[in-house]
Each structure stands twice: as C-alpha cells, then as structure tokens.
C-alpha cells in the first residue's frame, strides 16, 4: 500500500483514515486532468529557477502527458490507500521515473495545489455552462420572434390580468439569462486568478516565479497575497455557486411556467409527446416530468450557495479541512445544471403554442385596460375611463376590441430582441476563454 505524502513512522488508524479521506478519492476524479495541467506549469517553472534539470523536466512532462490522456479517457484511478489525486499523480511519476517524480512537490503544498485544481476545473466548467446558456438564449430569442404576434393571457396573482404575447414570454426568459451571465462572468473573473505559489498559505522560501505560472496557465492575474489566496478557498466556490443559482432560478421559473401552461386548465402550450411520461393507472396521462425534475434540480442548485456558506463562514484565515466537504456539493453541480439547460433547450425548441387562446370567452376581461386606454386617448380623464369600464363590467355591458396598441420599448409591439441579443453578445465577449484554452493546449503540446 502506498505511503501517505505526510506519513512518517506512525501507522494511521484505519477508521480515522476512512473518515478523513471521506469522498475525496471520488471527488478528485473531477480534478485529475486539471491537477496534471497544474503540475506541468509548476515543474516548467521549477526548471527555470534551477530546481529541475532540463532532462528531468522533459521526462516529467512526457509522463504527465500520458497521465493526462488516461484521465481524458476516464482510465485514471486513485488507488486504495492513496488519499487524493495529488498523491496518486506523484506516486505514478515516482514509480515510472524514480526520484525525479519526488521532486514535483518542491515549492508547493496540497493546499495551493487543490485550490489551483479547483480553479482550473471551475473555469473550464464555467465555459461549458456559458455555452449552454447561450444556446438556450438563442432558442428563446428565435421563438420570441417566431411568435411575436401571437397573444396570450398575462396574469398577476394568478388572476387574468392583461394581454401578453408568446414573444414577450420567450423573450423575458432570454433577457433573464443575460443578467444571469453577468453573474457568471463575475464568477469567472474571480476564478481566473492564479493561487499557485501560495503553498500552505504563507508562501515559500524557494524563489518561485508566480508570474510565469500565471502566464503558462492562461490566468488573467494572480491572487497576489498568499494568505488571501488560501482565504479565497470557499469564497470562490460560493460566488460561482451564486452564479449557478441565478441561472437555475431562471430555469426553475421557466419550468414551472411550462408545466402550468401545458396543463389542460391553461392549454397555452403543448410539450412534445416524446418529452412526456405516462401513468401506470391512467392511460390518458402525458406528464411533464422533465420540467418537474428540472424545477426540483434547479431549486436544489439554488440552495448551493447557502450550503457552501454554512461550511466556510465561521473559519478564520488559514487552511482547514472543513473546506474539503465543499467539493462534495460543488463539483457535481455543474453537470446537474448542464443537464437542465440541455433538456430545457431541446424542449423549448420543440414546444407548440396555442395561437387561439384568447378566443375563449373567459379571457373577455383581459382587454379592459386596452378599453380604458382607448377612452383616455380620446380625451376622457384616465380615472373616469377606468370607472366607466369598471361599471360596464359590473353591469355586464363591457364590449371591447381585441386589438392591442403597445409600441414602447419592450412591449408586445416592440420586443427589442435585437437589443437584448446585443446585450448577450457583449457579455459573451467579456469572457477570456480563449486565453485559458491556448495556454493549456501549449502545455500539452497540442
């Protein structure tokens, strides 16, 4: 069995080991590729300051590339008795290269190593989330344009209120995603700073070149203060979680709308039959399980910032093992949100809308405000017009036109989808994904 990196003469109690390692081996598989990338940058820097020879660097880089390929293929495993991904990589290098493999940890602690891994993993995941959000955004904008002239009831307090349109409905969620992407961009900028070189949280007496590793890894800048670099553990995850929760909040609300509008009592939209499920007892059922599960998953994701906060909020400066637990709730969250985005994008592209909803007599009063406004435009004081229409409704004498006259920005007749699309493009252009991709490919020689 492999010896722990920190193990000396005292044998570790097996129950203590099981408890302290917890789910780390499982969670660290998310980080394997990124741990290798971080090590490649670190040893390249070590060679530049004389702690590795050029020949040692070449041997280590070649073997790290092999480990990276194994991780890409899903073949990387953390062996029993090995605590984490960092220990496993060092063990594999030492088995293959002997004492050379033992040199890669110079000037580094597992504290800054895992923090680096988390940042490399997170920024890659943010890129995938941003791309998925952008895909959903474009579907919603296209549907908004396609159905911009199709009216639907607008509700307040779940009571019939005023005319709306499918153009407004689809477009509203598109614009909500723009604001969500602002949160994601802020999270990315916080994430895209280099903590490597902070070691255990107090730096190193080795003459490390942190600017070099920042460049090699494609970070925008450093976490300069080594104490703050470690204080950022938990804070970075929490702020990214806020961004994920913001997106999840939009998707959850959209899922609720879709479930409700798909029901027979509303009948505004129809989900594709192949996206619904049946009942074991009621043969007529077509249940919107996909959106119900999406709603639940997104509601769970909205609790993520609070979970992280409760783990990290009462810790003083310095590293504490409490932070390990954050990985268990944080790392799987990205795939869960990506799944929800993928399902929502597919269904929103295929959803059918009822183009004749307002022909139903129960929506007669939805045009009352239009009638009030018509009278006001003709010169009647607004309050008098409001009272007249209200009395007509009470007396059962209300008559109306189904024409709507909304021309201001963002209304039924002027959706401003081009402006909303421009806002989204501005946010998308603000992510520096290209820099990180170029840097990582250069390290891998691809």
Predicted segments with their positions:
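Short amphipathic alpha-helical segments with heptad-repeat character
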Residues: 119, 123-130, 134, 141, ...
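Alpha-helix capping and helix-loop boundary segments enriched in small/acidic/polar residues
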Residues: 105, 110-113, 157-164, 168, ...
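A general structural motif at alpha-helix termini
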Residues: 60-61, 217, 262, 273-275, ...
